[in-house]
Amino acid sequence: MAVVSVEELVVDPPTAARRLLGATLRSGQVAVRLVEVEAYGGDAEGPWPDPASHSGRGRTKRNAVMFGPAGYLYVYLSYGMHTCVNVTTGPDGTAGAVLLRAGEVVDGLDVVRGRRPTARTDADLARGPGNFGTALGIALDDYGTALFDPAAPIRLELADPLPAALIADGPRVGVSSEADRPWRFWLPSSPAVSAYRRSPRAPGAATVRAPR
């Protein structure tokens, strides 16, 4: 394990997203290696304006943690039922976060199988943002967890940076604003990566870039 700190995430969201690939998120008995992520910026006043982001229209009670320091957990419900897990990025006061879209279970496999009984294969266990949150047992009460605090119930462990040649990038899934911005990053070698689905409200066609 490389010697790392939260300072490695005090960067723009796409750079942080690439840095998170290969990292491990631990919660209780379960650990998941990150293989697919999406970067999200902030409001129009910040350095990374992003109308597709929850913080795109400014600070609210819901997204407040996105405007805080890097390395904290931003959790929200999608469609009122799926717990989505994000890691905050960038300097304190500047909104940014990375959505954790998919991972490979590396510890606690039996626990996760119990949480995801409908998964057809182990590669499905933490594939997709909602399944990722379920696999780790993360709930709304975990909002704001400091992921680099050794005493925290949920912890993030960064691995050595991966070569750019191992990482693919392309448009984000299901967003209608800035639909072609290539801020989704994944490891093509992993069977746990989710399929790309373009929002029906997004204009035009998308381009997915291979590893480079």
Curated annotation (Swiss-Prot):
CDD domains: AAG. Keywords: DNA damage, DNA repair, Hydrolase. InterPro entries: Formyl_transferase-like_C_sf, MPG, MPG_sf. One of its GO terms (biological process) is base-excision repair. Belongs to the DNA glycosylase MPG family. PANTHER family: DNA-3-METHYLADENINE GLYCOSYLASE. This is Putative 3-methyladenine DNA glycosylase.
